[in-house]
């Protein structure tokens, strides 16, 4: 249960989560913020949350400006380059899925089939990069351990928003919820997709209950690494 670099030296990772690319396509000062965390706070790892929609140019703020996703991916690449130059590490975190519909912007409680497309592309670009770890999916929730590992049909509730981005509410003040059902491939399939292109990067898998519970692992719900450099379990407080 330890991490080693390519020289066999044990590595202890202590760092920060640098948010914004999961909800913005061109956030201000993100690169500067990451560099500050590395240089002034002496973090040796950065967790970088991403949106699979924005990775491919489906963000609302990308229409007419970055519909290919090139600029978005360039920001990510610049950050990875800066981290690697300092001989530190970065987690590519799939933070926002889209319930199987590009541009839907309803983040699912599990990855979806489009998440496989995202990870195949990431693995082709950053497979076996010595400074990059793969955070397979941010926080699974409201599914069984069977679905978590092996996949299945899932339903997520979400609150539609009106103009001004205020959550719509009924006369009693309760949020108006809608439901969407989609197929989740399961975390084993996600790891398999990464390994299928030859990427052996450490794969990080979060537990259930918003990435908190890991008791299912003790009951046999483990992820097969398929010859990679290891599976890291992730628990969020």
Model segments located where?
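Conserved phosphate-coordination/catalytic loops
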Residues: 24-28, 70, 113, 181
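Short active-site-proximal "capping" loops at secondary-structure junctions
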Residues: 21-23, 51-55, 210-211
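Residue-level recognition of alpha-helix initiation/capping sites
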Residues: 28-29, 74, 117, 185
């Amino acid at each position: 249960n330890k991490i080693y670099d390519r020289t066999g030296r044990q590595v202890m990772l202590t760092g920060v989560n640098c948010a914004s690319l999961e909800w913005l396509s061109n956030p201000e000062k993100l690169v500067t913020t990451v560099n500050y965390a590395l240089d002034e706070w002496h973090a040796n790892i950065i967790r970088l949350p991403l949106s699979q929609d924005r990775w491919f140019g489906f963000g609302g703020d990308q229409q007419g400006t970055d519909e290919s996703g090139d600029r978005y991916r360039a920001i990510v690449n610049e950050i990875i380059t800066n981290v690697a130059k300092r001989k530190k590490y970065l987690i590519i975190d799939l933070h926002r899925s889209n319930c199987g519909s590009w541009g839907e912007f309803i983040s699912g409680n599990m990855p979806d089939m489009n998440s496989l497309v995202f990870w195949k592309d990431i693995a082709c670009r950053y497979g076996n990069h010595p400074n990059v770890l793969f955070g397979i999916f941010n926080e699974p929730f409201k599914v069984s351990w069977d679905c978590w590992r092996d996949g299945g049909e899932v339903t997520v509730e979400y609150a539609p928003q009106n103009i001004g981005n205020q959550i719509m509410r009924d006369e009693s003040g309760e949020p108006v919820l809608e439901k969407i059902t989609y197929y989740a491939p399961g975390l084993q399939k996600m790891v398999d997709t990464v390994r299928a292109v030859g990427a052996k990067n450490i794969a990080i898998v979060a537990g259930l209950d918003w990435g908190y519970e890991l008791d299912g692992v003790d009951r046999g719900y483990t992820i097969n690494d398929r010859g990679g450099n290891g599976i890291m379990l992730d628990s969020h407080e």
